[in-house]
């Protein structure tokens, strides 16, 4: 770590502690050249993979776009913001867990549908109808019938 006062490379850590609910490490440092002390904060940089669109183009992951799409599906449904945010965290965690630098947008779409299905089946159908481009009522019926046949449904 470079000393911000003299620019020397030799510094030592005097004290380290977790802050921000364990999300950051605060380090008190001392420069071995000039003796000045300073504080640094370290956070993990968690990068989400880039998305490979169906047309082959690539774009950075956009959390706001993901949130907006899920909010649109959940509009006027009895699902709290907290549950939506938890679903977003779960999706991002699964994307990071792939360890890949790029993932197909289809993977994100499937993760969203899985989370929406857990949150609210009406929202799931809304999202699926756009995502899978349902063309007629028959496709809606087939998806609803598939949902009804799943284990654990009355």
Swiss-Prot record:
Cofactor note: Binds 1 zinc ion.
GO biological process assignments: negative regulation of DNA-templated transcription
Top-level taxon: Bacteria
Alphabetized GO MF terms: ATP binding; DNA binding; zinc ion binding
UniProt keyword tRNA processing present: no
Keywords annotated in UniProt: ATP-binding, DNA-binding, Metal-binding, Nucleotide-binding, Repressor, Transcription, Transcription regulation, Zinc, Zinc-finger
Domain ATP-cone span(s) in chain numbering: 49-139
Named cofactor requirement(s): Zn(2+)
Zn finger (unnamed) location: 3-34
Any Pfam family: ATP-cone
Protein family: Belongs to the NrdR family.
Record NCBIfam families: transcriptional regulator NrdR (TIGR00244)
Biological function: Negatively regulates transcription of bacterial ribonucleotide reductase nrd genes and operons by binding to NrdR-boxes.
Official protein name in the record: Transcriptional repressor NrdR
Gene name as annotated: nrdR
